[in-house]
Amino acid sequence: MNLFTEIRTLVTAELGAMTEAGDLPAGLDLSAVAVEPPRDPAHGDMSTNAAMVLAKPSGKPPRAIAEALATRLAADPRISSAEVAGPGFLNLRLRPAVWQGMVATILQAGDTYGRSTIGAGQKVNVEFVSANPTGPMHVGHVRGAVVGDALARLLAYAGWNVTREYYINDGGAQVDVLARSAFERYREAHGLEPEIREGLYPGDYLIPVGEALKAKYGDSLLDKGEQHWLKEVREFATEMMMQMIREDLAALGVEMDVYSSEKALYGTGKIEAALDRLKEMDLIYEGVLEPPKGKTPEDWEPREQTLFRSTAHGDDVDRPVKKSDGSWTYFAPDIAYHYDKVTRGFDQLIDIFGADHGGYVKRMKAAVAALSAGRVPLDIKLIQLVKLWKNGEPFKMSKRAGTYVTLRDVVEQVGTDVTRFVMLTRKNDATLDFDFDKVLEQSKENPVFYVQYANARINSVLRKAREQGMDVSDATLATADLDRLDHPAEIALIAKLAEWPRLVEIAARTNEPHRVAFYLHELASELHGLWNRGNDEAGLRFLQDDPVVSQAKIALARAVGVVICAGLGILGVTPVEEMR
C-alpha cells in the first residue's frame, strides 16, 4: 500500500468533484498532479502541487483553486488539516489513526510491503561489469557490479522482468595480449625465463594459466611460431579468465543470467545485419569526418570511411563503423550487440559503463533509437572511480605493475555485505571513497553498521519480548492497540516507513539503487533517535510494564525491521540479527 498514492487518488477525486460542480473546467490533464513529502516537515505530512499545475490550463488563480480544494480535503476523515501556503501549494496533515494503521498494514503485508507492479512485467536487460577477460576483477569493477546487481534486484522488486547480462569483450586486441602473456607463463612452467615485455600483462594470476597450458599441451607449443598457437592459447586463457571472473562475481553475490561474446558477432553476419538495418533507413553512408577538436579519437582518420548518421538521433557528430582498410571500428560490434538485444524483445535496455566510457553514451543511444525505431529506451549509467584509503592514506593500484587491488582482496578484508552496502552510499556518477578501516568501524559515521545495528536492536527487543512470554508473530502484533503510538517521535518513524513504497517506485523509475541505501540510513536514524530518547523518557521505551502498550511499541519496531530487511534485500545485503 502506497499512502502517497492513496492520498493522490483522494486529491484527484476531489478535483473531479470540483469539475462536476463547475469550479474547474472539464478536460483538465491531472497527470502532473503530485503528492509528496514537504521539503520542511514542519509544514505538514504531505504536500500537493495540484493548484499550481492546474492554474494556467483552468484560467484560475492557484490560491483560489488551492483554497477550494483545501475545504473539500479537510472534510475527509483521514485529513486533520489542509493549509494553503505561498502562491498555491497545499500542505496536508493526516490524523494519527492513519499513521497508526500503517503499522498494521506493514505487518499484514510482510515482505510484500513496498513491492510494486509499476514494471508491469516489462522485459528489461541490465548489462553490467562486462570487464575485459584479461585478469581478475579489480576494485573499479566492484562498484559497477554492485550497482548493476542492486538495480536488477530493485527493478524485479518493482515488477520488471529482469535479465542480467555480461558482454565478454573477447574480440579485440586485448585478448591477443592476454594470449601472449599467458604463453610466457607457459614457457615459465617449463622452466624457461618468461619475457614479460612492455605491453604484456605482468600479473602472477597468469601463472596458473601457464601451468594449465602445460598440463594440456605438454611442450608441443614451445617451438612453434605465434601463428600456430595464438588462437588456441587465446581461447584457453580467455575461458580461464572468465571462470575466474564468474567466481569473483559469485564472491560478491552476483549471478548473471546471460554471457554474450563479442567474438561471436564476427564472421556470423550479425554486424552486417545490424548495419544493413541502418542502411535501409539511410543512416549509413561513405564520407570523411571533419578533424575533431582536441584529442583525436582512435576511430578518426582523414580518409573516406563508412559512417553512421548518429546525428539524426541526437549525437554530436556522425560515427565511423568501418575504417578505410575495411576493418570494423570498435563501435560496429557494439551496434550489432545492442541490435541483438533489441531483437530479443526487451522493452528497455540499461548499460552500466565506467566513467571513461562517457563519450560512448550519445552514439550508443542513437544506435538503439534508430535500430528500435524509438521503441526501446536505452539508459546508460556511468560509474565513477573508487578511491581506496588505508591507515588514513590513499591506497593506489597499478595494473601495469601487477599489484592492483582485486575484488577478492576487498571482499576478503571487509566481507561481501559491507562491500556491497558501501558501494551504494554514493550516487553512481560521484566518486566514492572506500576506507578499509572506516567501513568496519562500529560508529554512527559508518552507514553499514548504523543500518545493521538498527536491525539488531529491533531483534533484541523481539527476543526479550519472547523471553517474557509475549507472542511477537506479525499476525498477533498487527492486532495490537496501535492508538498507543501517539508520541510525535513515534509518528515520525511511522511516516518514514510510509515513504518506503514511494521510494521504491522513484528509485526504480530513475534506475538509482543508491536511493534505497540513503533511505535505509534515514530510517535507521529515526529508529536510533527514538531508542536514544527512551534512555531519558521511559514512556518511549519499546518494552513497558503495561503489556498492551508494549505490544503496540513492539509492533512498531517489527514494522521497521520488515522494511529494513526488504531494503537490504534489494541491496543484496544479509540483515544482521545480533551484534556481538
Swiss-Prot record:
Keyword Ligase: yes
Pfam family, one: DALR_1
Keywords associated with the record: Aminoacyl-tRNA synthetase, ATP-binding, Cytoplasm, Ligase, Nucleotide-binding, Protein biosynthesis
Catalytic activity: tRNA(Arg) + L-arginine + ATP = L-arginyl-tRNA(Arg) + AMP + diphosphate
CDD domains according to UniProt: ArgRS_core
Gene Ontology cellular component terms for the protein in this record: cytoplasm
PROSITE patterns: AA_TRNA_LIGASE_I
Any one GO BP annotation for this protein: arginyl-tRNA aminoacylation
Motif 'HIGH' region boundaries: 131-141
Family as reported in the entry's similarity comment: Belongs to the class-I aminoacyl-tRNA synthetase family.
Protein name: Arginine--tRNA ligase
